[in-house]
């Protein structure tokens, strides 16, 4: 993280759902898995103090949420919903602080970009519990009231974009998956343009893609034959990389999956809802 920060911009963090209060926290030595003490919210703030918290414009007293003023005219609002293990919920006491920060930014004539780990919008029709912030409706009302145009999230490990009215949410793909993407966000006074691109060499990208497809193929073989598993692997690769414009609907293989495994075909159909879409690019207006 310090090396990344040395490239010329700040590195800013927010806890994810695996970072705090974990009963299964462990370290690894060779093949051994050794239980260790988990990280608390206070530990997280101390460990990552140089990565946002030390220079926070404002910090919430009830969570690890904070505001970072990136430059004149732009603030980044980090909303924490993981201070309680597995909660996926913003503490109710945090909402007055969020509104006060949005009101202050509005009064100063400054734009706000929001960030969360779990998503504010539902990006897949099958997956809500554990993926979407449980009290997101209250947060969305504030974002609409104070004209927050975009939220950057993660958690799902897919590259995806969802828009509801004037609000856009970009789920940024995980570096550990498939194309190993990073997102580039270019801002103007009127809005922003987002592009996902691989952060690794073409050789490593090909290796990561092959590894991902092999795992997806193995999972598919648990319920189908090689042709069915290959189709599932292709769809998963397209979905996680955000390139559903490269996927296709195969009626014959869908029929075979429907006969073999109701859960898998339901999952496949949820992916195909985004058929034809390229989620590696997005734009929004302030």
Question: Whereabouts are the PLM-identified features?
Answer:
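A short C-terminal boundary segment appended to hydrolase-like catalytic domains
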Residues: 189-286
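Extended active-site neighborhood of metal-dependent phosphoesterases/phosphodiesterases
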Residues: 1-96, 184
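Acidic/histidine-rich helix-loop elements
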Residues: 29-32, 55, 85-90, 124-127, ...
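Short, electropositive alpha-helical surface patch
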Residues: 2, 25-44, 129-137, 164-176
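Catalytic metal-binding/acid-base residues of hydrolase active sites
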Residues: 17-20, 82, 119, 155-159, ...
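Short, surface-exposed coil-to-beta transition loops
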Residues: 178-182
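His/acidic metal-ligating clusters that form di-metal
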Residues: 9-10, 69, 75-77, 85-168, ...
């Amino acid at each position: 993280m310090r090396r990344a920060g040395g490239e010329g911009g700040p590195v800013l963090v927010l806890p994810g759902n695996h970072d705090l209060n974990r009963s299964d926290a462990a370290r690894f030595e060779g093949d051994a898995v050794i239980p260790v003490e988990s990280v608390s919210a206070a530990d997280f703030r101390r460990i990552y103090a140089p990565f946002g918290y030390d220079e926070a414009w404002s910090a919430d007293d009830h969570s690890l949420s904070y505001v970072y003023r990136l430059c004149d005219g732009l603030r980044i609002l980090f909303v924490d919903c993981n201070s309680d293990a597995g909660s996926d919920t913003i503490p109710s006491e945090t909402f007055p602080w969020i509104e006060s920060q949005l009101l202050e930014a509005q009064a100063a004539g400054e734009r706000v970009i929001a960030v969360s780990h779990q998503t504010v919008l539902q990006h897949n029709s099958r997956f809500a519990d554990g993926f979407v912030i449980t009290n997101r409706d209250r947060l969305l009302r504030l974002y609409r009231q104070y004209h927050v145009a975009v939220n950057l999230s993660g958690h799902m490990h897919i590259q995806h974009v969802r828009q509801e009215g004037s609000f856009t949410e970009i789920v940024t793909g995980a570096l550990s998956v498939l194309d190993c993407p990073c997102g580039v966000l270019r801002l103007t006074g009127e809005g922003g343009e987002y592009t996902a691109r691989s952060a690794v060499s073409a050789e490593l990208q090909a290796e990561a893609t092959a590894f991902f497809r092999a795992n997806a193929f193995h999972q598919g073989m648990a319920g189908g034959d090689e042709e069915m598993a290959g189709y599932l692997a292709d769809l998963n690769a397209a979905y996680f990389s955000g390139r559903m414009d490269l996927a296709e609907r195969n009626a014959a293989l869908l029929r075979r999956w429907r006969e073999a495994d109701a859960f898998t075909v339901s999952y496949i159909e949820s992916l195909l809802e985004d058929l034809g879409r390229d989620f590696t690019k997005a734009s929004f207006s302030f």
